[in-house]
């Protein structure tokens, strides 16, 4: 703690409460999340390498998917390693600046993922509804601009929230009832007025998710109309199945983010938030490679080709 000339001390570190359970359950949670971390590392790195080396996957859809895998990897790695350490350690502290950095990167990658998901939905809309214009509308230059704007948008949003959150004073209370440095539980510890922060969170923060979600819903609405016009039942079923799985993943991700960050502060419930946060910080990065790649014939064919070449060379 850092002492001031008033009757309080400023916080120099925070304690991440995490999931308070018996020690034997902490070991079980450690092993479970370690397994999920390994799955995400293998799945996302493998997918990025596959897209990189296979010439048949050099298309806008897989370009966006590669960036989504990268963001998922960074997003997950910002939170889970510290959480794994805390499962095995009695010291669950994180420095003031460490907390600021963790929240900054979390917010950056969370919003960047929302922008990329919106870009992917638009890409699918153009591919299915305007296939003759696809190569023109989704040229390499436009795809690069969309990705750069996604990262810039995520970074700008994160800078706003992080700056306003860490100019606040945190006095005496330093236990964050969460498994990472998230904004709602952090604001509860501040000894200064958080009205502006809560307004930013419920308006500016949620508007990013709402705008991206609207783009996704509109894109898939027009995709659905096009799918219904397909005469072949098998073709209609295949396209609808792929779109439905994508939309399910997006709805879970965007829905949980909107629930956490757009509701009034008086509805805040730390234990509920922790459970919901597990979905968008951990399970969605695990599910994305399964939803976007393992059900995709091109990716499976590319993976089989790489495996066959490895077997033949050995």
From Swiss-Prot:
It comes from the Eukaryota. It is a multi-pass membrane protein. Keywords: Cell membrane, Disulfide bond, G-protein coupled receptor, Glycoprotein, Membrane, Olfaction, Receptor, Sensory transduction, Transducer, Transmembrane, Transmembrane helix. Disulfide bonds join 99-191. The keyword Iron does not apply. It is found in: Cell membrane. Residues 49-56, 123-141, 220-239, 295-314 are cytoplasmic. The chain crosses the membrane at residues 28-48, 57-77, 102-122, 142-162, 199-219, 240-260, 274-294. One of its GO terms (molecular function) is odorant binding. Residues 1-27, 78-101, 163-198, 261-273 are extracellular. The keyword rRNA processing does not apply. Belongs to the G-protein coupled receptor 1 family. Odorant receptor. This is Olfactory receptor 5I1. It comes from Homo sapiens (Human).
């Amino acid at each position: 703690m850092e002492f001031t000339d008033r009757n309080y001390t400023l916080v120099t570190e925070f304690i991440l409460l995490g999931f308070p359970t018996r020690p034997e359950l902490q070991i079980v949670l450690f092993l479970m999340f370690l397994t999920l971390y390994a799955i995400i590392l293998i799945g996302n790195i493998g997918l990025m390498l596959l897209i990189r080396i296979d010439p048949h996957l050099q298309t806008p859809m897989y370009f966006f998917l590669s960036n989504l895998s990268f963001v998922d990897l960074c997003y997950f790695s910002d939170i889970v390693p510290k959480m794994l350490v805390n499962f095995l350690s009695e010291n669950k502290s994180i420095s003031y600046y460490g907390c600021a950095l963790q929240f900054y990167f979390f917010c950056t990658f969370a919003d960047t993922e929302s922008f990329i998901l919106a870009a992917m939905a638009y890409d699918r809309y153009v591919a299915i509804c305007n296939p003759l214009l696809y190569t023109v509308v989704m040229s390499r230059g436009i795809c690069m601009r969309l990705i750069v704007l996604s990262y810039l948008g995520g970074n700008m949003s994160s800078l706003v929230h992080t700056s306003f959150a860490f100019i606040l004073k945190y006095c005496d209370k330093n236990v964050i009832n969460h498994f990472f440095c998230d904004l709602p539980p952090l604001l509860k510890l501040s000894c200064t007025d958080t009205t502006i922060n809560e307004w930013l969170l419920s308006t500016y923060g949620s508007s990013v998710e709402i705008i991206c979600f609207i783009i996704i819903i509109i894109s898939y609405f027009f995709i659905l109309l096009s799918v219904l016009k397909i005469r072949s039942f098998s073709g209609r079923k295949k396209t609808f199945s792929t779109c439905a799985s994508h939309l399910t993943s997006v709805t879970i991700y965007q829905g949980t983010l909107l629930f956490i960050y757009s509701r009034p502060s008086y509805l805040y419930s730390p234990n509920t938030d922790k459970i919901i946060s597990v979905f968008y910080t951990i399970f969605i990065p695990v599910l994305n490679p399964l939803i976007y790649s393992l059900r995709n014939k091109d990716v499976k064919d590319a993976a089989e080709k790489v495996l066959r070449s490895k077997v033949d060379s050995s």
